[in-house]
Regions:
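Carbohydrate-active catalytic/glycan-binding domains of CAZyme proteins
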Residues: 19-357
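Bacterial Sec-dependent N-terminal signal peptides
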Residues: 1-22
Length: 357
C-alpha cells in the first residue's frame, strides 16, 4: 500500500512537470513595481535586453534616440546604450553608449537598434540591427533609405563593459536571389544555443515580391551556425505564419529550456491569441517548426502595477528575457504610451521589467 502511494505521488509530480512544458508551457507575469521602469526625459527608450555580468551586476542593453527627431527616427538616429543595476528589475542607471555612429561607409555606421545580448563560451555577444542611408530625417516619416538597408550584426566582448569588437560586414546579409524572402532587408535577430551546441537565429526578412518601396511579404526565417559569429546557413522557410495574414507576427525572442524551444512573439492582430494586439507564446521541438502553446496569450498591451493601477498602452513589445540557471526570471518589454490630442506624436516610451513566476 505504501509503495502504491509513493508511485502515485511520483506520477502526480511527473504529470505536473510535464504539463508545464511543450504545448502546455506557461509564463506568469507578476505585478510591477514603479522602480522597474527605465526611461529618459530626452530620449525615446526602447527594447532592453538584460544579462547578469561577471561582476555580479545586471546589465541592460537598449535602443535610444533623441526625442527632438520624433519617434520614427528609430530608423535613422537610434544608438545602442548600456545601463547597470544591482537588482535584476532595476532601477537601472545609464552607463555608456555602446555603438555610436561611425560613418555612412559602414553597413551599420548610421544606426544601431534592437539589441539582444547573450553569453556563450566565456564571451558576451551583442546581436543587433544596423543600417546606413542618406541621413535625411523628417519628423513623423519613416526613412526608407535606412529602413531598406537594415542588416543583422554582432559584436563580441570579454566584459559587459566592453570594449566591443564590431565587424565590417553583417553576420547575416540579404539573399542575393531577388526572389528570396529576405532579398530586400532583415531585422530583429534572436538567438539561442541549440541542443547539439549549434546556434539558432530567427530574424525578420522582407522580400522584393510586393510592389512599392515597402516591399514584402514580411516573414520570419531561421538560420543555423556552428559559431556565434557565423557563418549562418539560412533556412528560407517562413515561420509564425497564418493563412491570409501577410504580416501576423514580429519581434520573436527565442530560448531553449529543457527539451523544447520557446518563443515570445508579438501578435499584431490576434491571429494566434484572438485578443487583438498582444504577445503570444510558441514552442518547437527542433527550433524550426513552431506552434502556439495551448492558451498562448501572454499579455495584452497593458501594465498591472503593485499599487493596483493598470496602464493601457499603444504598444507593449520587443520581448527579452532575463534567464538565470536555465529558466526565465523576468520579462523586459518596450512600452509606448497611448496617444490622444494632447500628446499626438510626442507620447513617451519606456522599458518595463516584469518578474515571472
Amino acid at each position: 500500500m505504501k509503495k502504491l502511494f509513493i508511485i502515485a505521488i511520483i506520477l502526480m509530480v511527473t504529470n505536473r512537470m510535464l504539463a508545464q512544458t511543450g504545448p502546455d508551457y506557461q509564463l506568469h507575469l507578476q505585478l510591477v513595481d514603479e522602480s522597474s521602469v527605465f526611461e529618459s526625459p530626452d530620449y525615446y527608450t526602447w527594447g532592453g535586453s538584460p544579462i547578469k555580468g561577471n561582476d555580479g551586476l545586471y546589465h541592460l542593453y537598449y535602443s535610444r534616440w533623441e526625442k527632438k527627431y520624433g519617434f520614427m527616427a528609430w530608423v535613422t538616429h537610434s544608438e545602442i546604450a548600456h545601463a547597470v543595476s544591482k537588482s535584476p528589475l532595476g532601477p537601472y542607471v545609464f552607463h555608456d553608449v555602446v555603438f555610436p555612429r561611425r560613418g555612412k561607409q559602414y553597413w551599420d555606421g548610421m544606426n544601431t537598434h534592437n539589441p539582444t545580448v547573450h553569453f556563450f563560451n566565456g564571451k558576451y555577444y551583442l546581436y543587433y540591427t544596423g543600417n546606413t542611408g542618406d541621413d535625411n530625417n523628417v519628423v513623423g516619416q519613416l526613412n526608407f533609405s535606412h529602413r531598406n538597408n537594415q542588416r543583422l550584426g554582432v559584436a563580441v566582448a570579454d566584459s559587459p563593459y566592453g570594449p566591443w569588437k564590431r565587424f565590417d560586414k553583417p553576420v547575416i546579409d540579404v539573399s542575393a536571389d531577388s526572389t528570396a524572402p529576405d532579398a530586400l532587408m532583415m531585422a530583429n535577430p534572436s538567438i539561442t544555443q541549440m541542443k547539439d551546441g549549434r546556434y539558432l537565429m530567427i530574424y525578420k526578412g522582407v522580400a522584393k515580391k510586393n510592389p512599392g518601396i515597402f516591399g514584402g511579404p514580411v516573414v520570419h526565417l531561421c538560420a543555423i551556425a556552428k559559431s556565434p559569429l557565423g557563418p549562418f546557413k539560412k533556412i528560407l522557410k517562413p515561420i509564425f505564419i497564418v493563412k491570409d495574414s501577410p504580416f501576423p507576427a514580429e519581434d520573436p525572442y527565442i530560448w531553449l529550456q529543457g527539451k523544447y524551444y520557446y518563443a515570445i512573439v508579438k501578435d499584431f492582430h490576434g491571429a494566434f491569441t484572438h485578443h487583438g494586439l498582444s504577445l503570444a507564446l510558441f514552442y518547437s521541438k527542433n527550433g524550426i517548426d513552431w506552434k502556439p502553446v495551448n492558451n498562448c496569450l501572454l499579455t495584452v498591451p497593458e501594465i498591472h502595477w503593485k499599487n493596483g493601477k493598470v496602464t493601457k498602452l499603444k504598444f507593449l513589445e520587443r520581448p527579452q528575457l532575463l534567464i538565470e540557471h536555465g529558466k526565465p526570471t523576468a520579462l523586459f518589454l518596450a512600452a509606448h504610451e497611448l496617444e490622444d490630442s494632447t500628446n499626438m506624436g510626442k507620447a513617451n516610451t519606456f522599458n518595463v521589467h516584469i518578474a515571472l513566476k
